[in-house]
Swiss-Prot record:
Protein name (Swiss-Prot/TrEMBL): 3'-5' ssDNA/RNA exonuclease TatD
Biological classification of the source: Bacteria, Pseudomonadati, Pseudomonadota, Gammaproteobacteria, Enterobacterales
GO MF terms, alphabetically ordered: 3'-5'-RNA exonuclease activity; magnesium ion binding; single-stranded DNA 3'-5' DNA exonuclease activity
E.C. no: 3.1.11.-, 3.1.13.-
Pfam families per the UniProt record, alphabetical: TatD_DNase
Gene: tatD
Subcellular location: Cytoplasm
Length: 264
């Protein structure tokens, strides 16, 4: 089982990153994709991935919250990062109209620019969409035939949004959000509609600690070592064997991100 979304650059992991990675290995997690959300964090994620070349890859991109800082220099730096062997996808990029830390116009500019970089580099995109589905799809769709893959990270949308995303060919990332008996029930009901070859699983650690995890860590911090819990729960709700599902999502992640195969 491969965790496609780990924010290992978070300050919450500053004191024990090595132990976090070791616990993930011990738990049976077969690889980690470290998320970049700004130029600085993308650089840090790449450097961290280089410390674990057989286990970690990273992404390089600018999150919509940080899109107000996008400029030509940002684009050049993301381009440069995309050339490093540790960087397996462009992102986390997309639209977030929930809080609008950057204006919609700034978000759209940064998103479109990153789609262009991914297309030029023939790299997958690691996508974020919140309360922006229609505009997100309008901007993304013209690029899809130019991209090797598109991964919708931390999907929490509606059934119609899921159907749109699947028709467009997107991979669907599911987090421990689905383990929340309050806000995750609607998503839980959608799980059987995701084809086996389109499903990816992720912790989004240190965020989104599964609410049904027992015992919970005293820190209330999520870690990639809890991915097996998400695998077991998702397998049960999809009516599948957990061991099989773990292998399946690992195969999907390796097919999309091709860790260890950059330049081949």
């Amino acid at each position: 089982m491969f965790d496609i979304g780990v924010n290992l650059t978070s300050s919450q992991f500053r004191s024990d990153r090595e132990q976090v990675v070791a616990r993930a290995r011990q738990a049976g997690v077969t690889g980690l994709l470290l998320t970049g959300t700004s130029v600085e964090e993308s650089e840090q994620a790449c450097l961290l991935a280089a410390q674990y070349p057989d286990y970690c890859g990273s992404t390089a991109g600018v999150h919509p919250h940080d899109a107000s800082g996008w400029n030509d220099d940002t684009a050049d730096l993301i381009h440069q990062l995309a050339g490093r062997e540790q960087v397996l996808a462009i992102g986390e990029c997309g639209l977030d109209f929930n809080r609008n830390f950057s204006t919609p116009q700034e978000q759209e500019q940064a998103f479109s620019a990153q789609l262009a970089i991914a297309a030029e580099r023939a790299m997958p995109v690691f996508l974020h969409c919140r309360d922006a589905h229609a505009r997100f799809m309008a901007l993304l769709t013209p690029w899809l035939d130019k991209l090797p893959a598109a991964v919708l990270h931390c999907f929490t949308g509606s059934g119609d949004e899921l159907d749109d995303s699947l028709r467009a060919g997107l991979m669907i990332g599911i987090t421990g959000w689905v383990c929340d008996e309050r806000r995750g029930l609607a998503l839980r009901a959608l799980l059987p509609r995701i084809p086996d070859d389109r499903l990816l699983l992720e912790t989004d650690a240190p965020y989104l600690l599964p609410r049904d995890l027992h015992p919970k860590p005293a820190s209330r911090r999520n870690e990639p070592c809890f991915l097996p819990h998400i695998v077991r729960q998702v397998a049960a709700w999809r009516g599948q064997d957990a061991e099989w599902l773990g292998r399946n999502v690992d195969e999907n992640a390796r097919r999309i991100f091709r860790p260890g195969q950059r330049g081949e």
